[in-house]
């Protein structure tokens, strides 16, 4: 590769112990080399790019000042932790990041003792870190420090506020680092964003900040005891002057900052100075997402996970998609605009994922009818419920794995009142390289028991458009649409917007030996597998697209129960409690006794890899489905022998 970086210091760092042997004056060079290593690796092995560039100095400072892994670092989300992985002994394996069998996309305790808590979703770091701090205190370990790292985007989550509220009542060694870069994946939104901006820019606070900076400079010549005494005195002055305008100080959490999160020497010095102060503390850092790579600094959203690129020029290697089917996300976004143009009651809601779910299409064309509520899934659902209660028709788009966080809101604030909220579950099924925290495996199983819900999963883009149209018609109540990440199957995806009768599936193909019942896009793999199995076995296999998990198409299922002795169900959700379970229950309730083989995501947390690899791993790819259908064909009676016996 051109301009291959030279790592004079990074090559000698295999653990934080090696880092701590360096002089503080060497840390800027370590940061430069670490940043270049991240750029080099991710240019050819794609992952979460911009966030990790923004936390290089913070990562180095934490492992330099604190005695990790004895001291605990808890990352929020984990998008920003690649530097942490490299410094903690995983540099040689980093090229396997997010690959099947390779290191994991987010910090994981199963992978390293330096990864103290599983992450992937937002806003949980403060609560987890507080729990660790309390555990240390209960065990009499008053030397252990626990540090939570949370971004300003995650601070909009209710769980973060719950953790802050509880932290304020404990005397434990907890440090909360607020990594303020004005970004989640997209721009941060809401009152907390504005509050942090005001906290930084107010004249009154800047005066205090300037005085504190002068004081810290002078403290450099003092011994440790005097330094700590003066810091306590300075914090008392700051508290008296700023407590009324500082939400953290008002919650009895000592506030330090804001400081430049890219000044490694000063950051290390501040961490040392506040390290041994007892009680909960928060250090506010200003960082730049994408720091050190100009294209990422300028366009942080596009460079959140950019794919492959040239590490020198920044040119992104974008695949040629001409002639390919569209993304399900873009079909959703464009269809929503089409519906909103005809139905003035329609509004869109997303919790901090406007670009990921294509809600940004509605935002750009009808900005007053689209709402990014920040990382706040429960609020997004209840907010939608409130709008629906007074006559609007919300389309609330939340990734399937994140909708888990809003379960009570769905029941209490939408379903009980039978409110017409359309819950759009993006990223349903296996999502690939982000792994178990992000797979949309459980939605059918956890939503199926809730009364009043309609639950549908389209097989293709035409079905998605028609179901979206159906969902916004009068008197449909709460309506769930689940669809996968990635491309559909139809190049010509536009079709007339027509109503689909609620609870009605469809027969895709006649057959007489085996009935295959599928739901959602995996039905396309099932269709191909059926054709192959019929060709190899000579048997006749029927195919039904159930389309609706709730209400079930009872007429269709009665037909299947009366006609077939062998049924195969195929779904892209967990096998426990999903569509296959619903079919089994129906057959038992109506005293049909077929053999039912269920195919779906197994009862385990599926790790990371490409979507194709994971479908193969779970026995849900076309080849595996074909083999299973052939196995079922072998269980059928030999018709030639039956004919001989009857003659």
Curated annotation (Swiss-Prot):
Listed pathway(s): Metabolic intermediate biosynthesis; 1-deoxy-D-xylulose 5-phosphate biosynthesis; 1-deoxy-D-xylulose 5-phosphate from D-glyceraldehyde 3-phosphate and pyruvate: step 1/1
EC number: 2.2.1.7
Cofactor(s) listed: Mg(2+); thiamine diphosphate
Entry binding sites for Mg(2+): 152, 181
One term under GO cellular component: cytosol
Gene3D superfamilies: 3.40.50.920, 3.40.50.970
Keyword Metal-binding listed: yes
Co-factor note (free text): Binds 1 Mg(2+) ion per subunit. Binds 1 thiamine pyrophosphate per subunit.
Swiss-Prot/TrEMBL keywords: Isoprene biosynthesis, Magnesium, Metal-binding, Thiamine biosynthesis, Thiamine pyrophosphate, Transferase
Keyword Transferase: yes
Disulfide bonds: none
GO annotation terms (biological process): 1-deoxy-D-xylulose 5-phosphate biosynthetic process; isopentenyl diphosphate biosynthetic process, methylerythritol 4-phosphate pathway; terpenoid biosynthetic process; thiamine biosynthetic process
Gene Ontology molecular function: 1-deoxy-D-xylulose-5-phosphate synthase activity; magnesium ion binding; thiamine pyrophosphate binding
Family (UniProt): Belongs to the transketolase family. DXPS subfamily.
NCBIfam families noted in UniProt: dxs, PRK05444.2-2
Function statement: Catalyzes the acyloin condensation reaction between C atoms 2 and 3 of pyruvate and glyceraldehyde 3-phosphate to yield 1-deoxy-D-xylulose-5-phosphate (DXP).
Subunit comment: Homodimer.
Protein name from the UniProt record: 1-deoxy-D-xylulose-5-phosphate synthase
Annotated organism of origin: Bacteroides thetaiotaomicron (strain ATCC 29148 / DSM 2079 / JCM 5827 / CCUG 10774 / NCTC 10582 / VPI-5482 / E50)
Gene field: dxs
